[in-house]
């Protein structure tokens, strides 16, 4: 009887071991940052056209996402990644987590947003530039994101390095810290929890976000509650790619092609408030007023992969 039980158990284990291979032929898995959004219609369109079931895993901000993929690169958790950006791409390249090349899928300009109503009610002049945020008038009014885990946070850190130089950028951060800046772990926490302009419940009227974010805050009167500071922003490019050792490379190829298609890219502005890379994709008309691209950008041409750890160490010495 014990022998029979052992044989049955072995058979069950054998069948269980075969299951993932069977699933790989019918399912493709996408891992993305928490801000990734896709409509039910797009999911249905992809599944019908490709024949693959789509599974989505969300893995935090771009920094957390990239770090998790590095830790699991020998046994990847997905077939395709969406959301590694130009601030964390160096980590992906250094660790060989991508099969082939990362392909640009969208872009957005990292810049500060402020709550117009908050400033109007208090008759306070809002900042004209992120350089103003160290002034006493804006004490304890600003929330940024951690450059160790957040791609907008690392983007803004690079912006300050580009603006002040390797030897002087720390002084800006010391002054910002002394002026009561709040540091959130990621963009979603900063924007939806701490920023007053997104929900009305946050305690900070200035937040590190994107030039397109005010388009998400249009009120019934046709005006946006928020505005963006459009000078000296950081152009953040997000990428999509097939993970090395992906279980379903055929499905991965189909999914990457779909994410770059005109059909899916048309949905990106309204769902994720980013600019699509497909030139045929349609940009919402209201974006020209409420979500324009930055007037000027700075920092994205730096060698972030080479200097990232040194900058982060200097930043951590101020905030830890």
Indicate residue ranges for each PLM-predicted region.
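Periplasmic solute-binding protein
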Residues: 86-96, 104-125, 149, 153-163, ...
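A structural signal for short loop-to-beta-strand junctions that line the ligand-binding cleft
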Residues: 76-81, 96-116, 130-132, 140-147
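Short, low-complexity disordered leader/linker segments with a strong preference
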Residues: 1-28
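Periplasmic-binding protein-like
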Residues: 140-148, 258-282
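Early extracytoplasmic/lumenal segment of secretory-pathway proteins
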Residues: 18-91, 199
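Short beta-strand->loop
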Residues: 99-105, 131, 205, 218-234, ...
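A bilobed periplasmic-binding-protein/Venus flytrap-type ligand-binding module shared by bacterial periplasmic
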Residues: 113-118, 236-251, 267-271
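Ligand-binding pocket segment of bilobal, Venus flytrap-like solute-binding proteins
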Residues: 159-231
